[in-house]
Amino acid sequence: MSMFRLPVIYTCFPGGKHKVLTMSYDDGRQEDYRLVELFNKYGIKGTFNLNAGIDWDDKRIPLNEYRTVYAGHEVACHTYTHPTIARCPLEQVAQQILADRRGLEDLIGRPVRGLAYPNGSYSKDIIAMLPSLGIRHARVVPTTGHFGMPENFLEWAGTCHHNGQLMEKGRAFAELFKTQYLYMMYVWGHSYEFTDRDNWHVMEEFCQFIGGR
């Protein structure tokens, strides 16, 4: 019996990588200016989950600045006006997501395909209709503490909130070496929390440690 080689093909992240880091930040607050600057400084990419229907809050970045401020990062939906959608009729939920998606696409000039559930609120019925609304991934509030890929990209739990042992998680992620597995570190939060807690140094230290790898 003759032997022959069977090729082994692995799914990889872009560039053939087996590990990736992503950051997910909600609400488009003024502190995003500083957060985006940090990400850009250390070569880190993030997703910013925004509301195209909130143009009256001076704590938020003006809508007409979205295209420039978030250039180079993903922009995703956070619904049009941030209602607690599990309490809303499904028709209204669809309107909230579609209006936000279309509004954001007009503002930034590129496709919007992600969602972060506002107030962490969602239901199985909402999940089921997301593909018909053009949404391919959606983040929830609970976290996993690990670096595996999600079973359902429309109910995507991140690794940790940035107040949840961020540096400890970052060091553990950096030490992962088995290339036969896919690993993702997924951090989420709100940029204003750094101001509220006076702990911007937490993100600065993390970005400096993890960036450029």
Model regions: which residues?
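N-terminal pre-catalytic segment of deacetylase/amide-hydrolase enzymes
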Residues: 1-23, 58-63, 199-213
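A short acidic, amphipathic alpha-helical/loop segment
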Residues: 10, 34-38, 65, 125-129, ...
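Short, flexible, glycine/charge-rich loop motifs used to bind or transfer phosphoryl groups or to couple energy/partner
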Residues: 10-12, 64-65, 105, 175-176
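Catalytic grooves of carbohydrate-active enzymes
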Residues: 16, 28, 107, 159-213
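Generic enzyme active-site microenvironment
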Residues: 22-25, 76
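Conserved beta-strand->loop/alpha-helix structural units within folded catalytic cores of enzymes
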Residues: 25-28, 32, 39
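Soluble or luminal CAZymes and related metallo-dependent hydrolases
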Residues: 31, 58-61, 92-99, 165-169, ...
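Metal-dependent polysaccharide deacetylase catalytic core of the NodB/CE4 family, i.e.
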Residues: 40-136, 142-160, 181-194
